[in-house]
A protein has these predicted regions:
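Non-catalytic helical/linker scaffolds that mediate oligomerization, partner binding
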Residues: 1-470
Length: 470
Protein backbone atom coordinates (compact mmCIF):
# COMPACT_ATOMS: atom_id res chain seq x y z
CA UNK A 1 0.00 0.00 0.00
CA UNK A 2 1.40 3.39 -0.98
CA UNK A 3 2.31 5.51 2.03
CA UNK A 4 2.95 8.92 0.41
CA UNK A 5 -0.27 10.75 -0.46
CA UNK A 6 -1.02 12.58 -3.72
CA UNK A 7 -2.68 15.99 -3.98
CA UNK A 8 -4.07 17.02 -7.38
CA UNK A 9 -5.10 20.51 -8.45
CA UNK A 10 -8.46 20.48 -10.21
CA UNK A 11 -8.83 22.64 -13.31
CA UNK A 12 -10.00 22.58 -16.93
CA UNK A 13 -8.15 19.34 -17.66
CA UNK A 14 -9.73 17.44 -14.77
CA UNK A 15 -13.09 19.01 -14.00
CA UNK A 16 -15.19 16.36 -15.68
CA UNK A 17 -16.53 13.22 -14.04
CA UNK A 18 -14.74 10.66 -16.20
CA UNK A 19 -11.26 12.16 -15.80
CA UNK A 20 -11.71 12.87 -12.10
CA UNK A 21 -12.89 9.31 -11.51
CA UNK A 22 -9.82 7.94 -13.28
CA UNK A 23 -7.56 10.22 -11.23
CA UNK A 24 -9.11 8.98 -7.97
CA UNK A 25 -8.68 5.36 -9.04
CA UNK A 26 -5.07 6.09 -10.10
CA UNK A 27 -4.19 7.28 -6.60
CA UNK A 28 -5.39 10.84 -5.95
CA UNK A 29 -6.04 11.40 -2.23
CA UNK A 30 -6.76 15.13 -2.02
CA UNK A 31 -8.36 17.56 -4.49
CA UNK A 32 -6.85 21.05 -4.44
CA UNK A 33 -8.82 24.11 -5.53
CA UNK A 34 -6.63 27.09 -6.40
CA UNK A 35 -8.56 30.24 -5.46
CA UNK A 36 -6.03 32.43 -7.26
CA UNK A 37 -8.13 31.55 -10.30
CA UNK A 38 -11.83 31.12 -10.92
CA UNK A 39 -15.07 32.48 -9.48
CA UNK A 40 -17.07 31.10 -6.56
CA UNK A 41 -19.58 29.75 -9.04
CA UNK A 42 -16.86 27.81 -10.87
CA UNK A 43 -15.42 26.43 -7.63
CA UNK A 44 -18.88 25.44 -6.42
CA UNK A 45 -19.27 23.25 -9.51
CA UNK A 46 -15.87 21.64 -8.88
CA UNK A 47 -16.73 20.91 -5.25
CA UNK A 48 -20.05 19.35 -6.26
CA UNK A 49 -18.23 17.16 -8.80
CA UNK A 50 -15.59 16.05 -6.28
CA UNK A 51 -18.29 15.13 -3.76
CA UNK A 52 -20.21 13.21 -6.41
CA UNK A 53 -17.17 11.20 -7.50
CA UNK A 54 -15.93 10.42 -3.99
CA UNK A 55 -19.41 9.25 -2.97
CA UNK A 56 -19.68 7.08 -6.08
CA UNK A 57 -16.30 5.47 -5.37
CA UNK A 58 -16.71 5.48 -1.56
CA UNK A 59 -13.26 7.05 -1.20
CA UNK A 60 -12.20 9.62 1.43
CA UNK A 61 -11.07 12.26 -1.07
CA UNK A 62 -10.40 15.44 0.92
CA UNK A 63 -10.87 18.97 -0.47
CA UNK A 64 -8.16 21.58 0.04
CA UNK A 65 -8.91 25.27 -0.55
CA UNK A 66 -5.73 27.13 -1.51
CA UNK A 67 -6.02 30.86 -0.81
CA UNK A 68 -4.79 33.62 -3.08
CA UNK A 69 -2.91 35.23 -0.20
CA UNK A 70 -1.57 38.79 0.06
CA UNK A 71 -1.29 40.06 -3.49
CA UNK A 72 1.25 42.59 -4.71
CA UNK A 73 1.04 43.56 -8.37
CA UNK A 74 2.09 46.24 -10.79
CA UNK A 75 -0.78 47.90 -12.64
CA UNK A 76 -0.95 48.61 -16.37
CA UNK A 77 1.14 50.08 -19.17
CA UNK A 78 -0.19 52.28 -21.96
CA UNK A 79 1.31 49.85 -24.48
CA UNK A 80 0.45 46.70 -22.50
CA UNK A 81 4.10 45.82 -21.92
CA UNK A 82 7.56 47.38 -21.85
CA UNK A 83 11.14 46.12 -22.09
CA UNK A 84 13.47 47.06 -19.25
CA UNK A 85 17.24 46.73 -19.68
CA UNK A 86 19.72 45.89 -16.97
CA UNK A 87 21.05 49.18 -15.55
CA UNK A 88 17.90 51.18 -16.35
CA UNK A 89 16.37 53.41 -13.70
CA UNK A 90 12.74 52.47 -13.09
CA UNK A 91 10.12 53.85 -10.70
CA UNK A 92 7.29 52.08 -8.89
CA UNK A 93 4.69 54.46 -7.50
CA UNK A 94 1.67 54.25 -5.21
CA UNK A 95 0.13 57.10 -7.24
CA UNK A 96 -2.15 56.39 -10.20
CA UNK A 97 -0.15 56.87 -13.41
CA UNK A 98 -0.16 55.47 -16.92
CA UNK A 99 2.75 53.04 -17.09
CA UNK A 100 5.63 53.39 -19.54
CA UNK A 101 9.35 52.51 -19.81
CA UNK A 102 10.18 54.59 -16.73
CA UNK A 103 7.32 54.16 -14.24
CA UNK A 104 4.34 51.99 -13.25
CA UNK A 105 1.72 52.09 -10.49
CA UNK A 106 1.40 49.34 -7.86
CA UNK A 107 -1.70 48.04 -6.08
CA UNK A 108 -0.14 48.09 -2.58
CA UNK A 109 -0.42 51.61 -1.18
CA UNK A 110 2.07 51.11 1.67
CA UNK A 111 4.93 50.07 -0.60
CA UNK A 112 6.79 53.37 -0.30
CA UNK A 113 6.70 53.01 3.50
CA UNK A 114 7.71 49.35 3.67
CA UNK A 115 10.72 49.45 1.34
CA UNK A 116 14.08 51.09 1.89
CA UNK A 117 17.26 51.57 -0.18
CA UNK A 118 19.02 48.27 -0.78
CA UNK A 119 15.83 46.19 -0.82
CA UNK A 120 15.09 43.92 -3.78
CA UNK A 121 11.92 44.01 -5.88
CA UNK A 122 11.19 41.18 -8.31
CA UNK A 123 8.40 41.08 -10.89
CA UNK A 124 6.83 38.16 -12.74
CA UNK A 125 8.15 35.36 -10.50
CA UNK A 126 11.65 36.78 -10.38
CA UNK A 127 12.07 37.15 -14.15
CA UNK A 128 12.82 40.88 -13.77
CA UNK A 129 14.69 42.21 -10.74
CA UNK A 130 15.29 45.66 -9.28
CA UNK A 131 17.26 47.16 -6.39
CA UNK A 132 15.75 50.09 -4.49
CA UNK A 133 17.93 53.21 -4.76
CA UNK A 134 15.76 55.86 -3.14
CA UNK A 135 12.32 56.53 -1.66
CA UNK A 136 10.98 59.87 -2.84
CA UNK A 137 7.52 60.59 -1.50
CA UNK A 138 5.12 58.17 -3.17
CA UNK A 139 7.81 56.89 -5.54
CA UNK A 140 10.20 53.97 -5.16
CA UNK A 141 13.15 54.66 -7.44
CA UNK A 142 15.05 51.52 -8.44
CA UNK A 143 17.85 50.26 -10.65
CA UNK A 144 17.17 47.22 -12.83
CA UNK A 145 19.67 44.45 -12.03
CA UNK A 146 18.05 41.79 -14.24
CA UNK A 147 16.34 43.05 -17.36
CA UNK A 148 13.30 41.66 -19.10
CA UNK A 149 9.74 42.37 -20.18
CA UNK A 150 7.11 43.83 -17.85
CA UNK A 151 3.45 43.45 -18.76
CA UNK A 152 0.14 44.38 -17.18
CA UNK A 153 -0.71 43.22 -13.63
CA UNK A 154 2.30 40.98 -13.10
CA UNK A 155 3.01 39.83 -9.55
CA UNK A 156 5.66 41.44 -7.37
CA UNK A 157 7.69 39.98 -4.53
CA UNK A 158 10.11 41.41 -2.00
CA UNK A 159 12.72 38.86 -0.87
CA UNK A 160 13.53 38.92 2.85
CA UNK A 161 10.81 41.50 3.57
CA UNK A 162 7.65 41.16 5.66
CA UNK A 163 5.12 43.73 4.50
CA UNK A 164 3.12 45.77 7.00
CA UNK A 165 -0.32 45.37 5.43
CA UNK A 166 -2.98 43.04 6.89
CA UNK A 167 -2.36 39.36 6.18
CA UNK A 168 -5.95 38.44 5.35
CA UNK A 169 -7.35 40.27 2.34
CA UNK A 170 -11.09 40.74 1.88
CA UNK A 171 -10.89 38.30 -1.04
CA UNK A 172 -9.30 35.62 1.14
CA UNK A 173 -11.90 36.15 3.87
CA UNK A 174 -14.69 35.75 1.33
CA UNK A 175 -13.07 32.63 -0.16
CA UNK A 176 -12.55 30.97 3.23
CA UNK A 177 -16.15 31.63 4.31
CA UNK A 178 -17.25 30.18 0.97
CA UNK A 179 -15.13 27.11 1.70
CA UNK A 180 -16.69 26.67 5.13
CA UNK A 181 -20.16 26.82 3.60
CA UNK A 182 -19.27 24.15 1.04
CA UNK A 183 -17.53 21.74 3.40
CA UNK A 184 -13.84 21.91 2.49
CA UNK A 185 -11.51 19.87 4.71
CA UNK A 186 -8.33 21.96 4.58
CA UNK A 187 -7.39 25.59 3.98
CA UNK A 188 -3.91 26.15 2.54
CA UNK A 189 -2.84 29.62 3.64
CA UNK A 190 -0.54 31.35 1.16
CA UNK A 191 2.59 33.30 2.16
CA UNK A 192 2.46 32.55 5.89
CA UNK A 193 5.25 34.46 7.64
CA UNK A 194 4.45 33.95 11.33
CA UNK A 195 2.13 32.15 13.71
CA UNK A 196 -0.07 35.25 13.82
CA UNK A 197 -1.01 34.71 10.17
CA UNK A 198 -2.23 31.22 11.09
CA UNK A 199 -4.05 32.52 14.17
CA UNK A 200 -5.84 35.12 12.03
CA UNK A 201 -7.19 32.36 9.78
CA UNK A 202 -8.05 30.16 12.76
CA UNK A 203 -10.07 33.01 14.27
CA UNK A 204 -11.94 33.52 10.99
CA UNK A 205 -12.66 29.79 10.67
CA UNK A 206 -13.85 29.42 14.26
CA UNK A 207 -16.08 32.50 14.06
CA UNK A 208 -17.85 31.20 10.95
CA UNK A 209 -18.47 27.55 11.75
CA UNK A 210 -15.20 26.18 10.39
CA UNK A 211 -13.57 24.99 13.59
CA UNK A 212 -13.22 21.48 12.13
CA UNK A 213 -11.23 22.71 9.11
CA UNK A 214 -7.48 22.17 9.36
CA UNK A 215 -4.96 24.81 8.26
CA UNK A 216 -1.96 24.05 6.06
CA UNK A 217 0.57 26.90 6.09
CA UNK A 218 2.30 27.52 2.77
CA UNK A 219 5.98 28.33 3.29
CA UNK A 220 6.94 30.70 0.50
CA UNK A 221 9.36 33.26 1.98
CA UNK A 222 12.32 33.65 4.32
CA UNK A 223 10.19 34.60 7.32
CA UNK A 224 8.10 31.47 6.88
CA UNK A 225 11.23 29.32 6.81
CA UNK A 226 12.69 31.04 9.89
CA UNK A 227 9.43 30.78 11.86
CA UNK A 228 8.39 27.30 10.75
CA UNK A 229 8.42 25.77 14.25
CA UNK A 230 6.01 28.31 15.74
CA UNK A 231 3.91 28.14 12.58
CA UNK A 232 3.66 24.33 12.82
CA UNK A 233 2.72 24.56 16.50
CA UNK A 234 -0.44 26.41 15.46
CA UNK A 235 -1.59 24.44 12.40
CA UNK A 236 -1.85 20.93 11.00
CA UNK A 237 1.17 21.13 8.72
CA UNK A 238 2.88 23.00 5.91
CA UNK A 239 3.19 23.08 2.16
CA UNK A 240 6.66 23.70 0.76
CA UNK A 241 5.60 25.93 -2.15
CA UNK A 242 8.86 25.84 -4.05
CA UNK A 243 7.85 28.19 -6.86
CA UNK A 244 7.49 31.41 -4.90
CA UNK A 245 9.99 30.17 -2.31
CA UNK A 246 12.63 29.98 -5.04
CA UNK A 247 11.97 33.63 -5.85
CA UNK A 248 11.92 34.86 -2.26
CA UNK A 249 15.15 33.05 -1.32
CA UNK A 250 18.11 32.11 -3.57
CA UNK A 251 16.98 29.13 -5.64
CA UNK A 252 20.12 27.17 -4.73
CA UNK A 253 18.84 27.05 -1.14
CA UNK A 254 15.51 25.42 -2.00
CA UNK A 255 16.62 21.74 -1.88
CA UNK A 256 18.30 22.04 1.53
CA UNK A 257 15.41 24.12 2.90
CA UNK A 258 12.99 21.48 1.61
CA UNK A 259 14.86 18.74 3.49
CA UNK A 260 15.05 20.84 6.65
CA UNK A 261 11.33 21.66 6.65
CA UNK A 262 10.41 18.03 5.93
CA UNK A 263 12.52 16.84 8.87
CA UNK A 264 11.03 19.43 11.25
CA UNK A 265 7.46 18.47 10.33
CA UNK A 266 8.18 14.78 10.75
CA UNK A 267 9.63 15.33 14.20
CA UNK A 268 6.67 17.51 15.22
CA UNK A 269 4.07 15.06 13.92
CA UNK A 270 2.81 17.55 11.33
CA UNK A 271 1.91 16.96 7.70
CA UNK A 272 4.32 18.24 5.05
CA UNK A 273 3.43 18.68 1.38
CA UNK A 274 6.11 19.00 -1.30
CA UNK A 275 4.76 21.08 -4.16
CA UNK A 276 5.49 22.86 -7.45
CA UNK A 277 6.85 21.59 -10.76
CA UNK A 278 7.22 18.00 -9.59
CA UNK A 279 6.16 16.57 -12.98
CA UNK A 280 6.00 19.86 -14.88
CA UNK A 281 6.94 18.38 -18.25
CA UNK A 282 3.85 16.16 -18.13
CA UNK A 283 1.73 19.21 -18.85
CA UNK A 284 2.79 18.54 -22.44
CA UNK A 285 4.36 15.06 -22.44
CA UNK A 286 3.02 11.62 -21.45
CA UNK A 287 6.19 10.70 -19.51
CA UNK A 288 8.16 12.58 -16.84
CA UNK A 289 11.80 13.55 -17.26
CA UNK A 290 14.49 11.66 -15.36
CA UNK A 291 15.11 14.75 -13.24
CA UNK A 292 11.42 14.92 -12.29
CA UNK A 293 11.42 11.24 -11.33
CA UNK A 294 14.41 11.90 -9.07
CA UNK A 295 12.72 14.97 -7.59
CA UNK A 296 9.60 13.04 -6.59
CA UNK A 297 11.64 10.06 -5.36
CA UNK A 298 13.88 12.23 -3.20
CA UNK A 299 10.88 13.93 -1.58
CA UNK A 300 9.41 10.49 -0.85
CA UNK A 301 12.75 9.23 0.47
CA UNK A 302 12.94 12.24 2.82
CA UNK A 303 9.54 11.31 4.23
CA UNK A 304 7.22 13.94 2.82
CA UNK A 305 3.56 13.30 3.70
CA UNK A 306 2.27 14.32 0.27
CA UNK A 307 3.48 15.19 -3.19
CA UNK A 308 1.43 17.61 -5.25
CA UNK A 309 0.45 18.13 -8.87
CA UNK A 310 -0.42 21.66 -10.02
CA UNK A 311 -0.59 22.47 -13.72
CA UNK A 312 -0.04 18.80 -14.56
CA UNK A 313 -3.51 17.85 -13.33
CA UNK A 314 -5.25 21.22 -13.68
CA UNK A 315 -4.36 22.23 -17.22
CA UNK A 316 -2.12 19.55 -18.70
CA UNK A 317 -2.73 17.11 -21.52
CA UNK A 318 -2.14 14.06 -19.29
CA UNK A 319 -3.79 14.51 -15.88
CA UNK A 320 -4.51 10.80 -15.28
CA UNK A 321 -1.07 9.72 -16.51
CA UNK A 322 0.50 12.29 -14.17
CA UNK A 323 -1.24 10.75 -11.16
CA UNK A 324 -0.23 7.25 -12.26
CA UNK A 325 3.40 8.33 -12.69
CA UNK A 326 3.43 10.02 -9.28
CA UNK A 327 1.97 6.92 -7.63
CA UNK A 328 4.41 4.56 -9.38
CA UNK A 329 7.44 6.64 -8.39
CA UNK A 330 6.28 6.88 -4.78
CA UNK A 331 5.51 3.16 -4.49
CA UNK A 332 8.83 2.07 -5.96
CA UNK A 333 10.80 4.45 -3.76
CA UNK A 334 8.96 3.28 -0.64
CA UNK A 335 9.63 -0.37 -1.51
CA UNK A 336 13.35 0.43 -1.63
CA UNK A 337 13.48 2.46 1.59
CA UNK A 338 14.47 0.68 4.82
CA UNK A 339 11.87 2.24 7.12
CA UNK A 340 12.53 -0.35 9.83
CA UNK A 341 16.21 0.53 10.09
CA UNK A 342 15.38 4.24 10.08
CA UNK A 343 12.93 3.79 12.94
CA UNK A 344 15.29 1.66 15.02
CA UNK A 345 18.26 3.99 14.51
CA UNK A 346 16.42 7.22 15.31
CA UNK A 347 16.88 8.50 18.85
CA UNK A 348 13.57 9.10 20.62
CA UNK A 349 12.63 11.31 23.55
CA UNK A 350 8.95 11.22 24.52
CA UNK A 351 7.08 14.51 24.77
CA UNK A 352 3.86 13.39 26.45
CA UNK A 353 1.79 10.28 27.16
CA UNK A 354 0.13 10.16 23.74
CA UNK A 355 3.46 10.57 21.97
CA UNK A 356 5.00 7.77 24.04
CA UNK A 357 2.06 5.46 23.31
CA UNK A 358 2.37 6.20 19.58
CA UNK A 359 6.08 5.34 19.63
CA UNK A 360 5.46 2.20 21.67
CA UNK A 361 2.83 1.04 19.17
CA UNK A 362 5.33 1.34 16.31
CA UNK A 363 8.09 -0.40 18.27
CA UNK A 364 5.78 -3.22 19.33
CA UNK A 365 4.50 -3.71 15.79
CA UNK A 366 8.05 -4.17 14.53
CA UNK A 367 8.94 -6.54 17.38
CA UNK A 368 5.99 -8.88 16.70
CA UNK A 369 6.29 -8.53 12.91
CA UNK A 370 2.76 -7.13 12.76
CA UNK A 371 1.00 -6.77 9.42
CA UNK A 372 -0.82 -3.64 10.55
CA UNK A 373 -1.17 -0.99 13.22
CA UNK A 374 -4.83 -0.17 13.79
CA UNK A 375 -5.50 3.22 15.36
CA UNK A 376 -9.06 3.84 16.60
CA UNK A 377 -9.18 7.61 16.89
CA UNK A 378 -11.83 10.27 17.49
CA UNK A 379 -9.80 13.25 16.23
CA UNK A 380 -7.17 11.50 14.13
CA UNK A 381 -4.40 12.87 16.36
CA UNK A 382 -3.08 9.48 17.44
CA UNK A 383 -3.00 8.28 13.83
CA UNK A 384 -0.98 11.36 12.88
CA UNK A 385 1.49 10.75 15.72
CA UNK A 386 1.93 7.11 14.72
CA UNK A 387 2.39 8.31 11.15
CA UNK A 388 5.22 10.65 12.15
CA UNK A 389 7.49 7.73 13.01
CA UNK A 390 7.38 6.57 9.37
CA UNK A 391 6.94 2.95 10.40
CA UNK A 392 7.27 0.15 7.81
CA UNK A 393 4.00 -1.33 9.12
CA UNK A 394 0.68 -0.49 7.43
CA UNK A 395 -1.40 1.96 9.48
CA UNK A 396 -5.19 1.64 9.50
CA UNK A 397 -6.86 4.80 10.83
CA UNK A 398 -10.38 4.00 12.03
CA UNK A 399 -12.78 6.80 12.87
CA UNK A 400 -16.51 7.40 13.22
CA UNK A 401 -16.31 10.95 11.85
CA UNK A 402 -16.52 11.45 8.04
CA UNK A 403 -14.50 14.67 8.35
CA UNK A 404 -11.63 12.85 10.11
CA UNK A 405 -11.93 9.99 7.59
CA UNK A 406 -11.17 12.44 4.80
CA UNK A 407 -8.56 14.36 6.79
CA UNK A 408 -6.54 11.18 7.35
CA UNK A 409 -6.19 10.97 3.56
CA UNK A 410 -3.39 13.52 3.92
CA UNK A 411 -1.50 11.55 6.60
CA UNK A 412 1.55 9.53 5.54
CA UNK A 413 1.03 5.79 5.63
CA UNK A 414 -2.53 5.91 6.97
CA UNK A 415 -5.37 4.05 5.25
CA UNK A 416 -8.57 5.74 6.53
CA UNK A 417 -11.50 3.49 7.44
CA UNK A 418 -15.00 4.62 8.44
CA UNK A 419 -16.55 2.78 11.37
CA UNK A 420 -19.77 2.83 13.34
CA UNK A 421 -19.96 4.07 16.90
CA UNK A 422 -19.48 1.21 19.33
CA UNK A 423 -20.66 0.70 22.92
CA UNK A 424 -17.26 -0.37 24.24
CA UNK A 425 -13.58 -0.53 23.37
CA UNK A 426 -13.70 -4.34 23.18
CA UNK A 427 -16.43 -4.21 20.53
CA UNK A 428 -14.52 -1.49 18.66
CA UNK A 429 -11.33 -3.60 18.64
CA UNK A 430 -13.30 -6.65 17.47
CA UNK A 431 -14.69 -4.69 14.51
CA UNK A 432 -11.27 -3.16 13.80
CA UNK A 433 -9.67 -6.62 13.69
CA UNK A 434 -12.35 -7.89 11.31
CA UNK A 435 -12.14 -4.86 8.99
CA UNK A 436 -8.33 -4.94 8.88
CA UNK A 437 -8.36 -8.65 8.02
CA UNK A 438 -10.56 -7.90 5.01
CA UNK A 439 -8.65 -4.81 3.85
CA UNK A 440 -5.19 -6.43 4.02
CA UNK A 441 -6.26 -10.02 3.30
CA UNK A 442 -4.66 -11.20 6.53
CA UNK A 443 -4.05 -14.90 7.12
CA UNK A 444 -4.29 -17.06 10.26
CA UNK A 445 -1.29 -16.41 12.45
CA UNK A 446 -0.78 -12.80 11.30
CA UNK A 447 -0.37 -10.26 14.09
CA UNK A 448 -1.86 -6.78 14.31
CA UNK A 449 -1.38 -4.10 16.96
CA UNK A 450 -4.43 -2.08 18.00
CA UNK A 451 -4.53 1.14 19.97
CA UNK A 452 -7.37 3.34 21.16
CA UNK A 453 -9.06 4.84 24.19
CA UNK A 454 -12.27 4.91 26.15
CA UNK A 455 -15.44 5.40 24.09
CA UNK A 456 -16.44 8.81 25.39
CA UNK A 457 -16.21 11.04 22.32
CA UNK A 458 -13.17 12.92 23.61
CA UNK A 459 -9.96 13.22 21.62
CA UNK A 460 -6.51 12.68 23.03
CA UNK A 461 -7.46 9.88 25.47
CA UNK A 462 -5.67 6.98 23.75
CA UNK A 463 -4.40 4.75 26.56
CA UNK A 464 -4.58 1.13 25.36
CA UNK A 465 -2.34 -1.07 23.20
CA UNK A 466 -3.34 -4.61 22.29
CA UNK A 467 -1.74 -7.35 20.17
CA UNK A 468 -4.17 -9.58 18.31
CA UNK A 469 -3.41 -12.71 16.28
CA UNK A 470 -5.70 -13.58 13.38
Amino acid sequence: MRKTKIICTIGPASENEEVLTQMCLAGMNVARLNFSHGSHEEHEKKIALIKKVRQKLNLPIAILLDTKGPEYRIKTFASGKVDIKTGDTFTFTVDEVEGDETIVSVNYKQLNKDLKPGDTVTVNNGMVKFEVQEISGSNIITKCVLGGTLSNRKSMSFPNKVMSGPYLSEQDKSDIIFGIKHGVDFVAASFVSSKQDVLDIRELLDANGGSDIEIVAKIENRAGVDNVVEICQNCGGIMIARGDLGVEIPYVEVPSVQKKLTRICRMMGKRVITATEMLESMIQNPRPTRAEISDVANAVYDGTSCVMLSGESAAGKYPVESVKAMAEIAEYTEQHTDYKQRFLSTGYVGKDNLDCISHAVCSMAIDVNAKAIVVCSVSGKTAMLVSRFRTPVNIIGMTTDPKIWRRLSMSWGVTPVMAEKFPSMDVMFYYAKKATTEILDLQPGDNIVLTGGAINGRSGNTDTIKIETI
